[in-house]
UniProtKB/Swiss-Prot annotation:
GO biological process: negative regulation of translation; translation
Lineage of origin: Bacteria, Bacillati, Bacillota, Bacilli, Lactobacillales
The name this protein goes by in its record: Large ribosomal subunit protein uL13
Record flagged with keyword Ribonucleoprotein: yes
Encoding gene (name): rplM
PANTHER family xref list: LARGE RIBOSOMAL SUBUNIT PROTEIN UL13M, RIBOSOMAL PROTEIN L13
Amino acid sequence: MRTTPLAKSSEIERKWYIIDATDVSLGRLSAAVATILRGKNKPQYTPNVDCGDNVIVVNASKIKLTGKKASDKFYYHHSSWRGGLKAVSYGELLANNPVKMVEISVKGMLPKNTLGHQEFLKMHVYAGEDHKHEAQKPEKLDINKLI
């Protein structure tokens, strides 16, 4: 009887992909990046093994927010002090720190455990077009083909 072949972390070949976020919706970009980080686009995907690839996201400042999300949707965090609830609109977050906005969105789509944290560390987001990963020879990935 044949058993299903399971991936081992030592046998996995990791690629580097670069994704241009210009005029791409935040949710669609995050879903595609999370899929690649988890390794769900590979035939040897195993849920308990980190078999995903490295992803570089450039031009995060040119991401598109649809509808009225820029003014009506908020990112909340609390300082654990009374009255310490902070709210920042997505429009402000896009203007001040677009890298954090993409990271928050992708992190919410990954598992909330140690494996999810390992997968999250393989994502590199840059607000502009310049990045420091030219030595890895990243393969350009068209986001519209993934969606």
